[in-house]
From Swiss-Prot:
This is Ribosomal RNA small subunit methyltransferase J. Specifically methylates the guanosine in position 1516 of 16S rRNA. CDD domains: AdoMet_MTases. S-adenosyl-L-methionine binds at residues 129-130, 182. It comes from Desulfotalea psychrophila (strain LSv54 / DSM 12343). Its main location: cytoplasm.
Length: 261
């Protein structure tokens, strides 16, 4: 797990309001607010682009971005512009139909990419993230996107909560038509998770070793289905065979129906 992190502000963005918010973030994460970032191996740096998790050089305090959530540019921006159609596999997996958009609980929000795609397609999505740092980065990315007049309409479909998904579902799971899971799976050589961004996420949140318990809870409360994203060729969670699978190049969706509409 990542540790020994500070929150650092770029001087030119500092205002009274930003300083108040920065103190609230530091308190929530239980990390120091410091202008001596070179004393830490990692830092949440707040600059004109927003919040990003960075590695810090002990030699000169320079930084390299590790994680940054951007719903308007990069991969998410590309998907919004090019891939957001109901023909894509995730739309079929969660139960999107002509004239019908399911309510979706994303139990493993991560970088928020899949939840964002579903929001683009008109689904009401609740993103749940238990890692405080991932939650903070997500919150910052969502807030920045909401400042754009076009993106604000899409982001209105997204709700973000910081919680343990299993515990939340035990109390509120019946509110959702579809429960979506994309658990971190054990590391394998040559896995797509060897990409730097995903390695950092793994270090930050660890493997989802409780995914079997989460699936069990989800199956008892989902209104229509539970969708589990898995690497292609990976075993089913707890060897529980789904009702059907949607296979892609490197991954698949295991679809477990809890009722038939």
């Amino acid at each position: 797990m990542l540790h020994n992190i500070t929150l650092s502000l770029v001087p030119e963005i500092i205002t009274d309001n930003i300083l108040i918010k920065a103190k609230e973030i530091a308190q929530f994460l239980n990390i120091p607010l410091s202008d001596r970032r070179e004393e830490y191996p990692q830092a949440l740096i707040w600059d004109r682009d927003g919040l990003s998790l960075c590695s810090i050089s002990a030699k000169d305090g320079s930084h390299a971005k590790l994680l940054y959530i951007d719903f308007m540019g990069g991969k998410n921006g590309y998907r919004h512009a090019n891939d957001c159609t109901t023909r894509q596999p995730i739309a079929k997996a969660v139960g999107i139909k002509p004239g019908f958009r399911p309510t979706v609980f994303d139990a493993t929000a991560g970088m928020g990419g899949d939840g964002f795609v579903l929001a683009c397609l008109g689904c009401r999505v609740t993103l749940c993230e238990r890692s405080p740092i991932m939650y903070t980065l997500l919150q910052d990315g969502i807030e920045r996107a909401r400042q754009d007049s076009v993106m604000n309409k899409i982001m209105a479909n997204l709700d973000l909560i910081h919680n343990n998904s299993k515990q939340f579902l035990e109390n509120h799971g019946t509110n959702y038509h579809t429960i979506y899971m994309d658990p971190m799976y054990p590391h394998k050589k040559k896995s797509a998770l060897n990409k730097k961004e995903m390695r950092v996420i793994r270090d930050l949140v660890g493997d989802d070793n409780d995914s079997d318990n989460l699936l069990e809870t989800a199956l008892t409360v989902a209104g229509n289905r539970v969708v589990v994203k898995r690497p292609k060729g990976a075993p089913y969670i707890e060897e529980r065979k789904p009702h059907h699978e949607i296979t892609m190049k490197n991954s698949r969706f295991d679809v477990y129906l809890t009722s038939y509409l």
